């Protein structure tokens, strides 16, 4: 399938795909996600039509909490609804996320992941915000590049509808949200072709309606609450297959090979990294550089983080692996490890990889740059089971020593850096 090439950033890529599947967008701007809401508002004003032949109804609320409440109400009324947020704004949505997930409403929250204010505020990128939502019941889908945002945002929307589970569709703030790339874009007819219209109609039929009234939002006593809470299990058990089904549809359309976990590197790798987000592009470049020197290394790119499918992860790891380094872009003080690391340990503990050494590392907090030389340090590390990269930690001595900068750019490439000064 031939697709149009356009130059855009990650925010516009997410907005382009999400607009197609949305009846309503409830918005409140926050850096670095504001561009998604602004683009959606602009397109609706210009009369752009979604796949249903309608303009998206855009409503700006008084806060992110209000936007989340509007998403909840709009979904309950039978309108496919999305929003765009990050950081403290996403935290304000958490109470509503529990309700949206508990009522199995197919909303999509598009997030350009950003740091949370702790010892200081940071408007820059990491995964602190999305990791604060991992127990809400929302599925979580991650993209690594602008092209992946374009390709996989439809998967979040379509899997939410068919799987009856809301999605947090996220990518790295600034590094992906504001990176401008020439990418292949979706035509809305192709997006419409992938949609399950029967599932969409079933969602609309389930809406609150005085012609067939039902009770929602009740309070339950101890005699039934636990049982009712467990009733959602089959939907989460089935969701990884639903996500892969739509990834396969995308693959069929555009010739890609998207999976819940994608492996890149040597077939007989002995040391691999497991990571999410834009760092995977850096890791891939570093793998190519090391492969030229005969190193057997690889990376598993996590796409579907929630629900975490242990078998899909196991299937993605080469049998030859002797050491795994898990990279997390968040910090949970006091925990035994960061979230992705703990999930990997739990997934592999009873598998054929139960004896493989698993190390845990932090990187990129507050948009700290992660370079190929730092990734080389991760692959060369065989002793420090807990580590950081990108900083010099002279307090707790967790940082890995980084060697001289390495050049992974292909020969013949011209690099340019442009500096802009002024208001």
Question: Residue locations for each model-derived region?
Answer:
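Conserved thiamine diphosphate
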Residues: 123-173, 197, 353-366
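Redox- and metal-dependent alpha/beta enzyme cores, enriched for Fe-S-associated oxidoreductases
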Residues: 267-295, 308-313
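Terminal amphipathic helices with adjacent charged low-complexity linkers/tails
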Residues: 172-211, 315-353, 359
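Conformationally flexible catalytic loops at phosphate/diphosphate-handling active centers
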Residues: 52-56, 167-262
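Peripheral docking tails and interdomain loops at the edges
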Residues: 323-411
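Thiamine diphosphate
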Residues: 1-132, 137, 154, 174, ...
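Short helix-loop-beta junction
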Residues: 42-47, 285-299, 349-350
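Short acidic, glycine/serine/threonine-rich loops at helix termini
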Residues: 36-41, 70-73, 93-97, 118-124, ...
């Amino acid at each position: 399938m031939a697709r149009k090439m356009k130059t855009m950033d990650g925010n516009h890529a997410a907005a382009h795909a999400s607009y197609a599947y949305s009846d309503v967008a409830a918005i409140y701007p926050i850096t670095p996600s504001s561009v998604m809401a602004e683009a959606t508002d602009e397109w609706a004003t210009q009369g752009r039509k979604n796949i249903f032949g309608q303009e998206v109804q855009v409503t700006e609320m008084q806060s992110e909490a209000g936007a989340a409440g509007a998403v909840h109400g709009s979904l309950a009324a039978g309108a496919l609804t999305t929003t765009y947020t990050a950081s403290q704004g996403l935290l304000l949505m958490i109470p509503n996320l529990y309700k949206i997930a508990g009522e199995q409403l197919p909303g999509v929250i598009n997030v350009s992941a950003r740091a949370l204010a702790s010892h200081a505020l940071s408007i820059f990128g990491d995964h602190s915000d999305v990791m604060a939502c991992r127990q809400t019941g929302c599925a979580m889908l991650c993209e690594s590049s602008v092209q992946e945002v374009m390709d996989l945002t439809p998967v979040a929307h379509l899997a939410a509808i068919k799987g009856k589970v809301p999605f947090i569709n996220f990518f790295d703030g600034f590094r992906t949200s504001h990176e401008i790339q020439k990418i292949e874009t979706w035509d809305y007819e192709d997006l419409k072709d992938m949609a399950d219209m029967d599932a969409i109609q079933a969602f609309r039929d389930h809406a609150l309606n005085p012609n067939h009234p039902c009770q929602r939002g009740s309070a339950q006593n101890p005699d039934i609450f636990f049982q009712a809470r467990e009733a959602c299990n089959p939907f989460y058990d089935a969701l990884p297959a639903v996500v892969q089904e739509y990834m396969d549809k995308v693959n069929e359309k555009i010739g890609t090979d998207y999976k819940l976990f994608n492996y890149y590197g040597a077939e007989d790798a002995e040391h691999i990294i497991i990571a999410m987000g834009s760092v995977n592009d850096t890791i891939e470049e570093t793998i190519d550089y090391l492969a030229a020197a005969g190193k057997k290394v690889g990376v598993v790119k996590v796409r579907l983080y929630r629900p975490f499918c242990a078998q899909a992860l196991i299937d993605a790891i080469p049998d030859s692996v002797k050491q795994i380094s898990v990279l997390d872009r968040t910090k949970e003080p006091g925990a035994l490890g960061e979230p992705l690391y703990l999930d990997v340990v739990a997934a592999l503990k009873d598998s054929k990889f139960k004896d493989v050494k698993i190390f845990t590392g932090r990187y990129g907090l507050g948009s700290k740059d992660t370079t190929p030389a730092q990734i080389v340090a991760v692959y060369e590390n065989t002793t420090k089971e807990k580590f950081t990269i990108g900083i010099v930690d002279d307090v707790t001595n967790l940082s890995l020593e980084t060697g001289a900068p390495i050049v992974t750019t292909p020969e013949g490439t011209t690099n340019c850096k442009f500096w802009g000064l002024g208001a």
